[in-house]
Amino acid sequence: MTNIRKTHPLMKIVNESFIDLPTPSNISAWWNFGSLLGMCLIIQIATGLFLAMHYTSDTTTAFSSVAHICRDVNYGWLIRYLHANGASMFFICLFLHVGRGLYYGSYTFIETWNIGILLLFAVMATAFMGYVLPWGQMSFWGATVITNLLSAIPYIGTTLVEWIWGGFSVDKATLTRFFAFHFILPFIVAALAVVHLLFLHETGSNNPIGLNSDADKNPLHPYYTIKTALGFLLMFLVLLSLVLFCPDMLGDPDNYMPANPLNTPPHIKPEWYFLFAYAILRSIPNKLGGVVALVLSILILAIVPFLHNSKQRSMIFRPISQCMYWLLMADLLTLTWIGGQPVEHPFIIIGQIASILYFTIILILMPLSSMLENKILKW
């Protein structure tokens, strides 16, 4: 008799995706981040649901309701800090997942890659709106500054901003709609993640050497489920260390002050995971130019597959491209650092150089490196 997991309509889908899935035998720990992102999403939805039970999306009570969660709700502090630091873990896993895709040439699965970019935008939107909800100083001013950027769009900009605000400034209407969107978006992210997996399973996984692995595959379970379990364990170790020992390390002290429209904080900055994009935005003196650069800093990932001109898929045997890749990583770390610094000399010029370098590496230096390596292969 055939096993029920192979015949039952629902279990068959689970079986083909998570149990009998043919997986390349040589994939490394870098292939763990997809499942870690799934776990992050589950943690965020679960903790977020319990937070939503006690949170009130009203400007007069939002800040107090978050304080009430931390002080009066059973393990409320734990749920709140798991949610806040869970977002940081989410972005760490996201950046490593995208970095892996760039290094090993996974972007040649164009549909999977493009849905991944959509997922990145959706998660960034969710995180931004979530940061507004505690209604602290940085929540309010972050929302004001970032939504105000849309006013740079010619002709419809101002109308668009007021439409998003639901008035003439960030106020009660804005907070209420941001809460509604913040609640619904993770479910849209979950649906997109299913589509992401669907397209991935059409082609099968890439592997470190970037060659066809049809001749050498293993079932996902038990060979990779055990590696996934170890990944979960390590992620929980880092997350719980953050939550239990230094829960506010990645946050901003200004957000412990209630939102005050009459008092601007000395340095308005977003959460650490947006700092690289914020640095690119600030490095351009023109408002519209800054907004375009901000969007392009992420959207540039969509043209990476078309810039790939190497005879090899992965970077594992391409030392010049590897140098360019690690230069890009160093540049992103520099941008992240600059995004958290005040707008003054020498940070302005460092940010501008790092921003130019970011686009130059991706658009010019990486394709040139590939061409050079192709030439070397012929010699």
From Swiss-Prot:
Cofactor: heme b
Residues that coordinate or bind heme b b566: 97, 196
Signal peptide: none
Cofactor detail note: Binds 2 heme b groups non-covalently.
PROSITE patterns for this protein: CYTB_CTER (PS51003), CYTB_NTER (PS51002)
Mode of membrane association: Multi-pass membrane protein
Free-text function comment from the UniProt entry: Component of the ubiquinol-cytochrome c reductase complex (complex III or cytochrome b-c1 complex) that is part of the mitochondrial respiratory chain. The b-c1 complex mediates electron transfer from ubiquinol to cytochrome c. Contributes to the generation of a proton gradient across the mitochondrial membrane that is then used for ATP synthesis.
UniProt protein name: Cytochrome b
